[in-house]
């Protein structure tokens, strides 16, 4: 049985959580951006894809808008990170409104992941998983760095994501007329997904599937694919 002192401590703990949640909910919604690169070839100028996905407006193009351009010194500050950013990758950026920086980053990355999962599931590699392979199966992947920006485009230095095991896609997808048709199909696919009654379950399983095929180690990929199956079937490892 809980002693009275323990009950009081627990109640104070619950109240402190409620207070923190209340503070967050009282914060105004603020616009944020996130920038990265993606394995589409950037040689063709212009915007290649722009769509509202989930809580974010996502855009793929050859160059960042001027608002989000940042000095090279920022990436240079990460040493080897700058050397790993592929120059032939297209630029990808997203915007959303959120109450905290962390919430904004999570929302946008989840929506970017959904976009890439639709593309990879529909048009991704048909290569099977082979033991000994040390590169991801997904052909559409983000670059090694994702950077958060505030509403005026200023870099938020405390929230930068870096993938230390980044593997470059040596032959990025070429943006041509066929690619434009594919992007339109992806857009229609996402629209249909949003209207589906099981959209949350489907989104979660698609993200898990895509995440599993982003991994370098095929053995870990198989574990991730099993988790995807568990999400879809509503089962766990002990069932």
Segments from the language model and where they lie:
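Charged, non-catalytic interaction/linker regions at domain boundaries
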Residues: 1-223, 227, 231, 236
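Short, charged amphipathic alpha-helical segments flanked by flexible coils
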Residues: 239
């Amino acid at each position: 049985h809980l002693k009275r002192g323990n009950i009081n401590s627990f109640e104070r703990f619950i109240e402190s959580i409620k207070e923190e949640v209340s503070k967050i909910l009282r914060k105004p919604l603020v616009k944020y951006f996130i920038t990265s690169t993606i394995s589409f070839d950037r040689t063709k100028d212009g915007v290649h894809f722009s769509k509202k996905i989930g809580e974010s407006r996502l855009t793929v193009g050859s160059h960042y808008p001027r608002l989000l351009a940042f000095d090279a010194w920022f990436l240079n500050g990460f040493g080897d990170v700058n050397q790993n950013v592929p120059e032939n990758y297209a630029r990808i950026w997203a915007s959303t409104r959120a109450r905290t920086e962390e919430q904004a980053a999570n929302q946008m990355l989840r929506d970017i992941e959904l976009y890439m999962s639709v593309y990879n599931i529909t048009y991704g590699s048909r290569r099977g998983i082979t033991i000994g392979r040390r590169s991801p199966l997904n052909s559409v992947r983000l670059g090694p760095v994702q950077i958060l920006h505030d509403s005026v485009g200023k870099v938020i230095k405390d929230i930068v994501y870096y993938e230390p095991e980044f593997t470059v896609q040596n032959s990025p997808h070429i943006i041509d007329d066929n690619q434009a048709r594919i992007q339109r199909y992806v857009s229609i696919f996402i629209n249909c997904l949003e209207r589906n009654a099981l959209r949350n379950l489907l989104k979660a399983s698609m993200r898990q599937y895509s995440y599993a095929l982003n991994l370098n180690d095929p053995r870990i990929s198989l574990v991730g694919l099993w988790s995807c199956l568990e999400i879809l079937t509503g089962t766990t490892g002990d069932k």
